Amino acid sequence: QRPVAGGRGKDAVIVSATNDVNFDGSYRYSFETSDGQRASQEGALKQVSAPGPDGDTLGEAVRGDFSYTDDAGNQFAIQYTADENGYVPQGAHLPTPPPIPEAIQKALAYIASQPQARS
């Protein structure tokens, strides 16, 4: 367990921080607090395949991570991406869907192998 200098939660202080914003729209930031919270993120503008509601074809591609320790001493860490596919977090403590049963996998493979019906 890390020693806590500056307290936990609302008493925590920022012990390191970076923030870089570039003219091309890319950026990077990170910080760490005295109670062990950490976060970092970087992003850049990206050409997207479909225009948004305002007709813009530029979007952001972001990736980052954050971690913290709860009051019980459990450590949590999340890595994520966010882009035209949405927010996609990953972490050992996050629930995952159950595996697809074999019979359903076979049925889906069969359906995919069939020619498309024309209307």
Curated annotation (Swiss-Prot):
Domain named Chitin-binding type R&R: residues: 24-98
Keywords, sorted A to Z: Cuticle, Glycoprotein, Pyrrolidone carboxylic acid
One Pfam family per UniProt: Chitin_bind_4
Keyword Glycoprotein: yes
One cellular component (GO) term of this entry: chitin-based extracellular matrix
Domain of life: Eukaryota
InterPro entries in the cross-refs: Cuticle_Struct_Prot, Insect_cuticle
Entry-listed glycosylation sites: 96
Keyword Transcription regulation: no
Protein's UniProt name: Endocuticle structural glycoprotein SgAbd-3
